Amino acid sequence: MSKTPWALGLLIFLLTFTSPLSSSPVRSTDNSTSSKGLLNVNSSVILEPSILPSSASKPESLHLSKVRVSGLRLEAHASSTENIVLGHNKKHNVVVVPNKNVRVVLFGQNFQDIGALTFTADGSCKDLAHFFEADFSSMTPIRVVVEMSFPKTTESKDSFKLCVSEKFYANPQFVIVEDPFTMVTTEIPPVDEYMPKWLSWICLLILLCFSGLFSGLNLGLMTLSPYELQLYIASGTEQEKRDAGRILPIRKKGNQLLCTLLIGNVVVNVGVSLLMDQLVGSGFAVLVAATSCIVVFGEIIPQALCVKLGLPIGARTIPITQVLLFLMYPLTWPISKVLDIFLKEELTRSLERNKLVEMLKLSEKSIIGGQSDEFKMVLGALELYDKTVAHAMTRYEDIFMLPHTLTLGAGMVTQILDMGYTRIPIYENDRKNIVALLFVKDLALLDPDDNHNVMKIASIYNHEVRRVLVDMPLRNMLEEFKRGEYHMALVERLVEQEDKDPIYELCGLITLEDIIEEIIQCEIIDETDAVCDNVHRKKRQRKRNHDMSQIVNTAHAKCAINIQMLAVTIQVMSTCHKIFSSNYILPTILEKLIRKNCKKVETTQFSCLKEVGVVQPKPAVLFTKGEFSNKFIMILSGRAVVTIGKEEMRLEAGAWHSFGTEVLDAMAEAIERSLNQSTSRSTVSLNTEITNNSIGFIPDFDTVILYECVFCEITAADLLLAYNSSQIMQNNTKMQVVRSNSRISLIEEIPKDAVSTPIRNGSVKLRTVSEGETVHLLPKNMECHFNKQEKYEEEEE
């Protein structure tokens, strides 16, 4: 009794499993002439498989007992260059090109039990060729490969379904696999359009414009450095100033601006490619069309425009740039900060001097149109840094010098004045042995008929002889001249000697004018130039001067007063202050001093002063309240108006009224102090006091001339000149020649215990070269250049 339920259950299971197979009709062998008959492996009988309709849910698992089909893949032949397999449609069916041979690869299980397979579009499993085991290109239990082609589908037959039959059945039947992943269609689905074509063309044009904008701004804005924009703001035109002012705040966000433009450019270029794929189609045509549009309209044209018009284009697109910076701020700000950390922030670097010089030379023709004077000056000032004294000095062979034995007669003074020099070196025996300097102004009050010796005059004034090395930079020499102590220096070089200490040999002379010539790149004919060009040594072409003997002939010198007024003026001045007495200034020198410094103001010069508020001419202003003055003035005739005090009380000063007696007192005290010093230092100290404005006063009144007036104006320098001239006249026969033993040089003093080669550091020091050292160091004597001139003068006399 216990076995009855189990037997009943087994019977029910067998009936259930075999009932579908027995219910399907068996196809006869009448259709054995079809495309391919079914080959039964276990028997020689050829049977046509019948069709078993599949159910809706997993037919392969319900109706195929052993075979399981998991999916399929379609492949084109390796030799085929055409794209045959087009992918999947929305139904997940594989899309292929119709009537093209493809390889169908099936994946699953128990494929060794497949008896036949085919594809059907109408559900009959007879509309395409059947494939048996012998027709398989490759077969494994999990993989089967067949080669076939699919005809073009119609609207009613839109896809091909897989039909599979198993072996080892008396009545083999096809089972249709309803899985959409195993279905094949030759109907090419329409391309999904993002938008209508007319709207796509409009968007394409807009994206191309933005691509060009990003590309152009990337080149135009990033090449405009903040330094260059500041130059436009400072020195550009009004339009350039406005444009640069708008761009500068945006341009300072260097890395953030760069990231914004690059990201925007990449995004719009990708959008152009997608729209081209929709409008033109896929394949090589899209590649050519997208590349051509991006390169031509997005790169070449905008960058060519922004290279030349970067400033105006960048200024007019600032609103768009600001919007893009705002929209992309969350993305670009972190990237820009990372770039700032690793690459540092963008620095505003100016051009180095050497690069600036080369840039000016390269842009000479294109910008300035040739070497104009302004261009030469700028270039000369920049090149001054690399030049030394040797580049600008006048060689010693071309220097106008005087021998120390020369006698200054009337004819010789005339010749010296005819040369046009104001500072003349004096040499002793050898032209390389310069011992003193003579200023032509020192001869102003001397009588040429007294035949003074040039060395005696130079010893009285004792002008310092400055010496520098030949390799001294011109910029340092210019700084020395700018201090105002001297504007001329001798140039020496170090000469090595065997078994002896090195010596310093004269090789030229440098003046402030020579440095200015190097700056302005133009030759200036000064008192040291015997040649017109220091480089090419071109001789000066002098114009014939007028008769200079009238300068030294005082008998016919013009004066603002007559002889009677001159005599009275001499008498008044000699008694008004001790500085005008014969103890300081000789009467003959005083006469020349008064003649030289008398001035007359005509009434016609004040015809314009009738109007109120007119500025007075310079000759009419004698003293200004609060301004330093170093002159003494005596009214000889006429009247001057003096304004005194806060109330501006006005007084008139008539004839023989004097102003500036403080200058006379200070000068007398300075002379008395100098008498207590050595002869070589007395004149130097007086010159130093006058140069430093130590002799003078600050008036607390204003003095102007409103009417016709004659007055005598004598400065502290005139008083010193008159005093020195008087000393020369008094000691003409007794004076002992004092050579310059205070020749100041920029060469360091060499210690006796030092090595033979002197060592110099960067500091500028002064040293005193004694006469004995000079005579010992300098070479042999040279002939006097003025011997022939003296003989010629003696013959004329």
UniProtKB/Swiss-Prot annotation:
Topology of this chain in the membrane: Multi-pass membrane protein
Known function: Probable metal transporter. Probably acts redundantly with the other metal transport proteins cnnm-1, cnnm-2, cnnm-4 and cnnm-5 to regulate Mg(2+) homeostasis. Promotes postembryonic gonad development by regulating Mg(2+) levels, probably via AMPK signaling.
Effect of loss of the gene: No visible phenotype. Double knockout with cnnm-1 results in increased levels of intestinal Mg(2+) and reduced levels in other tissues. This Mg(2+) deficiency in tissues leads to a reduced lifespan, 100% sterility, and smaller animals that exhibit a developmental delay with defective gonad development and which therefore do not produce oocytes or form vulva. In addition, the gonad development defect in the cnnm-1 and cnnm-3 double knockout is rescued when the AMPK alpha subunit aak-2 is also knocked out. Double knockout with cnnm-2 results in 22% sterility.
Keyword Secreted: no
Keywords: CBS domain, Cell membrane, Glycoprotein, Ion transport, Membrane, Repeat, Signal, Transmembrane, Transmembrane helix, Transport
Recorded GO CC terms: basolateral plasma membrane; plasma membrane
Record protein name field: Metal transporter cnnm-3
Record localization: Basolateral cell membrane
Domain CNNM transmembrane: 193-373
Keyword ATP-binding in record: no
Domain CBS: 393-454, 461-527
Glycosylated position list: 31, 42, 676, 692, 724, 731, 761
GO BP annotation list: determination of adult lifespan; innate immune response; magnesium ion homeostasis; magnesium ion transport; positive regulation of gonad development; positive regulation of multicellular organism growth; positive regulation of vulval development; response to magnesium ion
Endpoints of the signal sequence: 1-23
Extracellular side: 24-200, 277-280, 344-797
Similarity comment: Belongs to the ACDP family.
Cytoplasmic side: 222-255, 302-322
Free-text tissue specificity from the UniProt record: Highly expressed in the intestine and in neurons, but it is also expressed in a variety of tissues including the pharynx, hypodermis, rectum and in muscles.
PANTHER family xrefs: METAL TRANSPORTER CNNM, UNEXTENDED PROTEIN
Main subcellular location: membrane
Record field: transmembrane: 201-221, 256-276, 281-301, 323-343
GO molecular function: transmembrane transporter activity
Gene that specifies this protein: cnnm-3
